[in-house]
Curated annotation (Swiss-Prot):
Naturally occurring in which organism (per UniProt): Chlorobaculum parvum (strain DSM 263 / NCIMB 8327)
Miscellaneous remark of the record: Bacitracin is thought to be involved in the inhibition of peptidoglycan synthesis by sequestering undecaprenyl diphosphate, thereby reducing the pool of lipid carrier available.
Main location, first listed in the record: membrane
Species lineage: Bacteria, Pseudomonadati, Chlorobiota, Chlorobiia, Chlorobiales
Known catalytic reactions: di-trans,octa-cis-undecaprenyl diphosphate + H2O = di-trans,octa-cis-undecaprenyl phosphate + phosphate + H(+)
Keyword Zinc set for record: no
Classification via NCBIfam families: PRK00281.2-1 (NF001392), undec_PP_bacA (TIGR00753)
Ranges that cross the membrane: 40-60, 89-109, 113-133, 150-170, 196-216, 230-250, 258-278
Name under which the protein is recorded: Undecaprenyl-diphosphatase
Purpose: Catalyzes the dephosphorylation of undecaprenyl diphosphate (UPP). Confers resistance to bacitracin.
One cellular-component annotation, GO: plasma membrane
InterPro entries: UppP
EC number in record: 3.6.1.27
Keyword Transmembrane: yes
GO molecular function list: undecaprenyl-diphosphatase activity
């Protein structure tokens, strides 16, 4: 990987991590179309530290409030006394499924599931499920029922969204896509679904990034070029990730996810055609 490729992949990671179109799919597709080597699951996990930093900074006030409430309520012997501490514990509970599945299927995630067959299937499948979730949300709105706020999320909601997040281990699914979809089915409004999705991503993205950084440290530090490329990709992922968060939260206040559904279908079908005609190797 050269510096130009690192910059492009960092931008791709930042732009697509928080939109429901799958960053892992695009980090697999873009190199394939450009004739570059697959950067691999480890690169994806490490560069996600950049988008993790974007979430931390964008939601700094929320995170400080949640962490402060968890610590304060624990010291009082009432761990679930406030809405903020409940949210913190729900994020922790919702993280358990992706940790379990991530460890159980680690080898498949890094090899078999990176096939463009899986990527295209996941892009199309989630587009269809998200379209059903959107119809459910539209029906609720027509009935005059408002969506849940974060403080109204139940333990069942958190666990269902957490299990959905585990599906994002399949490239093409999209972490934000599956969690926003689950949130819509659980009657969260679109913006709240996205906001909870981003907060829920913090523990697992941090853990995966640190693990892959530790695991590949010798390779990364084997040359100055490797270190520079990873660092540059991570910085660009942070910048464009921050912009992506701001865009999506603003967009979902007034619009549905329809544009992303259409994009996923178009991309998934295009991939199948390109693979079938021999223009792209799976």
């Amino acid at each position: 990987m050269n510096l130009f490729q690192a910059i492009i992949l960092g931008i791709v990671q930042g732009l697509t991590e928080f939109l429901p179109i799958s960053s892992s799919a695009h980090l697999r597709i873009v190199p394939a179309l450009a004739g570059w080597d697959d950067p691999g699951a480890a690169f994806t996990a490490i560069v996600q530290i950049g988008t993790l930093a974007a979430v931390l900074i964008y939601f700094m006030k929320d995170i400080i409030s949640i962490v402060g409430a968890v610590v304060s309520d624990l010291l009082k012997g009432k761990p679930l006394a406030s809405d903020e501490s409940r949210t913190g514990w729900m994020i922790a509970a919702g993280t358990i499924p992706i940790v379990v599945f991530g460890l159980a299927f680690k080898d498949d995630i890094e090899t078999t599931l990176r096939s463009l067959y899986w990527v295209s299937a996941a892009l199309i499948a989630l587009a269809l499920v998200l379209s059903i979730a959107e119809k459910h949300t539209s029906n609720r709105a027509r009935q005059g029922r408002r969506g849940k706020a974060i403080s109204e999320i139940t333990w069942l909601d958190a666990m269902i969204i957490g299990f959905a997040q585990a599906m994002a281990l399949i490239p093409g699914s999209s972490r934000s896509g599956v969690t926003i979809t689950a949130g819509l089915f659980r009657n969260l409004d679109r913006e709240t679904s996205a906001r909870f999705s981003f907060l829920l991503s913090l523990p697992s993205v941090f853990a995966a990034g640190i693990y892959q950084l530790y695991k590949t440290w010798d390779v990364i530090t084997a040359s100055t070029d490797n270190m520079i490329n990873i660092a540059v990709a991570t910085v660009f992922a942070f910048i464009f990730g921050y912009l992506s968060i701001a865009f999506l939260l603003t967009y979902l206040k007034r619009h549905s996810t329809g544009i992303f559904i259409g994009y996923r279908l178009l991309l998934g079908i295009s991939l199948i055609i390109m693979i079938g005609t021999g223009h792209l190797m799976p």
